[in-house]
Amino acid sequence: MRPWRHIDGRFLYLPASQDVWNQLRARLQLAQRLSGTAIWVPHPGAIGIGVDVDLPIGGFVDVLLLPRDTTQWPLEGTQMEFYIWWIDEYPQIRLLPADPRHRREDFDEWISSQNGPAAAAFRTHHSA
């Protein structure tokens, strides 16, 4: 069952059980590429976007990884590629758009100054 569900005119996030998440998480890695569809863009510029990645756990792109210019945000229904940005105990996959047009405008500069595991994995997998 898909985690993003449209109920009474709004999207709800109802992920699979923690056991399912633990099994799935063991097969995922930072900077891994996934295909997905933007299905929830509630308030451009405020929160981020919900993404259906065809798994029992949903994806989410945080507002801090998206362009400041909200006209560059993907629209609901946009199919695109993502990189896994973060995975932890909470059953949700944090994502980074693979297409630079859908990332924050200063992404290249910003990523070089980040010290976390997601940034390190991205730099390792995407260094020239």
Give the role of each language-model region.
Residues 1-128:
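Single-stranded RNA-binding regions, centering on S1/OB-family and related RNA-binding modules
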